[in-house]
């Protein structure tokens, strides 16, 4: 179906998808709404029919994906799984999100979560919520005697998500090799590094034994 023949929801999604490509290619601050319209193959005014500004487009892209991630974390935490499997599932979701849509993840990382003085500040509540949910997983593992209690859950959550974000940054800027094998190893590296440092000596010895 052509852009002109698309339904209203399709046109909105068409514009959002085009915005991802434009933001990833040109950067949010360097592009104009007309660039998004051209990329989507729609009239300039149609973009404003759905979005008040390119800021609202970026907000929408971030909030849509972030909401999915928050829901995933909650669902994983609700399952009776070992903490390594829980954190592994979260790491897999984020890495696979990059694998399937690298442009979108580039936009989220570069233009939102690392933009401390602009969009990152605007969405600080949502960003903090992700850390808090991961922190709750860590606390439960501490209460079960799996993770060390002397390492604050807040720090552990930051270390976990920070490690994943640094991996994404490495791929975004071409500092790390990509491909199925590298993506799968990245998941393992994050979980092994973080959990290996958080696990009590008894748990660590049991794993080795």
What positions do the PLM features span?
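Amphipathic alpha-helical linker/stalk segments
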Residues: 3, 61-89, 139
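Short, hydrophobic secondary-structure boundary micro-motifs
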Residues: 106-108, 121, 150, 176, ...
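Amphipathic alpha-helical segments used for helix-helix packing
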Residues: 99-118, 169-173
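Generic hydrophobic, amphipathic alpha-helix propensity
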Residues: 11-19, 36, 61-69, 134
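Amphipathic alpha-helical packing segments from all-alpha helical-bundle domains
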Residues: 67-70, 74, 100, 118-144, ...
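Helical hydrophobic small-molecule/effector-binding pocket
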Residues: 69, 88-109, 135-136, 161, ...
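N-terminal intrinsically disordered/low-complexity leader segments
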Residues: 1-10, 21, 202-209
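Helix-turn-helix
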Residues: 3, 14, 22-56, 60
């Amino acid at each position: 179906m052509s852009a002109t023949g698309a339904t209203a929801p399709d046109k909105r999604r068409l514009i959002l998808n085009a915005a991802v490509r434009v933001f990833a290619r040109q950067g949010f601050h360097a592009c104009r709404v007309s660039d998004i319209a051209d990329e989507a193959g729609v009239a300039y005014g149609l973009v404003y029919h759905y979005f008040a500004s390119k800021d609202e487009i970026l907000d929408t892209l971030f909030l849509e994906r972030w909401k999915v991630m928050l829901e995933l974390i909650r669902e994983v935490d609700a399952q009776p799984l070992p903490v390594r499997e829980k954190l592994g599932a979260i790491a897999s979701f984020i890495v696979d999100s990059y694998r399937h849509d690298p442009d979108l993840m580039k936009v989220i990382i570069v233009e939102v979560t690392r933009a401390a003085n602009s969009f990152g500040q605007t969405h600080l509540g949502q960003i903090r919520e992700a850390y808090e949910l991961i922190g709750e997983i860590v606390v439960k593992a501490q209460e079960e005697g799996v993770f060390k209690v002397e390492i604050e859950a807040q720090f552990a959550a930051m270390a976990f998500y920070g490690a994943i974000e640094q991996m994404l940054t490495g791929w975004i800027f071409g500092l790390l090799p990509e491909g199925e094998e590298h993506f799968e190893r990245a998941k393992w590296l994050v979980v092994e590094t973080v959990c290996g440092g958080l696990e009590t000596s008894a748990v660590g010895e049991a794993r080795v034994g």
